[in-house]
A protein has these predicted regions:
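Secondary-structure boundary elements
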Residues: 1-62, 66
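Terminal low-complexity, poorly structured segments
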Residues: 9, 86-89, 175-177
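Intrinsically disordered, low-complexity, compositionally biased regions/tails
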Residues: 40, 46, 125, 156-157
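Alpha-helical and coiled-coil interaction segments, frequently adjacent to or embedded
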Residues: 140-184
Length: 184
């Protein structure tokens, strides 16, 4: 079984960039729990978190993940294909609301763009920017716009954290272990 999963990963990593991101967008939005059960958006038990981080191999095998898992697959694709990229962790944490997002920004055809995942409606070339700084500003502004929409008058800039990250995650770590690593 491990050979087939590795073969699948190699096949995915060798796709042309547009086909790779079409594949990424097709991954079902959800997560694998500590018991290796899958939970999909819309399931009754979706919010009963016992999250377990999925490696790129597990993500492909399960065809299920969310931005934390998918960002690692995208970073691996970029590394394997010589694509410059940076990864960012965005978090809003208040007493009443907690939301996170990880996002990979990549330079493809000399333009920076937010890499598509299974939760955003972006395309690799739309929008695109001349510099990483412009792309990062768009990402941060878009996240703040989303938060203001959700929180209305309760949005507080001091509750927002945005940082570049480059840590390595072991398979099957918990949500708390993931957050402890990425927040460092």
């Amino acid at each position: 079984m491990a050979v087939k999963i590795q073969s699948d990963l190699d096949d995915i990593l060798s796709l042309p960039v547009n086909e790779f991101f079409d594949y990424v967008r097709s991954i079902k939005y959800g997560y694998k729990d500590q018991d290796n059960d899958l939970h999909f958006l819309g399931d009754k038990d979706f919010k009963i978190y016992k999250y377990s981080f999925s490696t790129p191999e597990q993500l492909i095998h399960n065809n299920c993940g969310w931005c934390w898992d998918i960002s690692e697959l995208i970073k691996l694709y970029c590394r394997e294909n010589g694509v410059a990229c940076k990864s960012f962790f965005l978090e809003y944490l208040s007493n009443d609301f907690h939301h996170t997002h990880t996002q990979v920004l990549a330079c493809i055809n000399e333009k920076w763009s937010a890499c598509p995942d299974n939760s955003m409606g972006t395309e690799i070339i739309n929008p695109e920017f001349n510099t990483l700084g412009e792309c990062f500003k768009w990402l941060k502004d878009s996240y703040i716009e989303y938060l203001k929409y959700v929180l209305d008058d309760n949005f507080d800039d001091l509750k927002l954290s945005v940082k570049e990250y480059d840590c390595i995650f072991n398979k099957n770590i918990t949500e708390d272990e993931y957050l402890n690593l990425i927040r460092k």
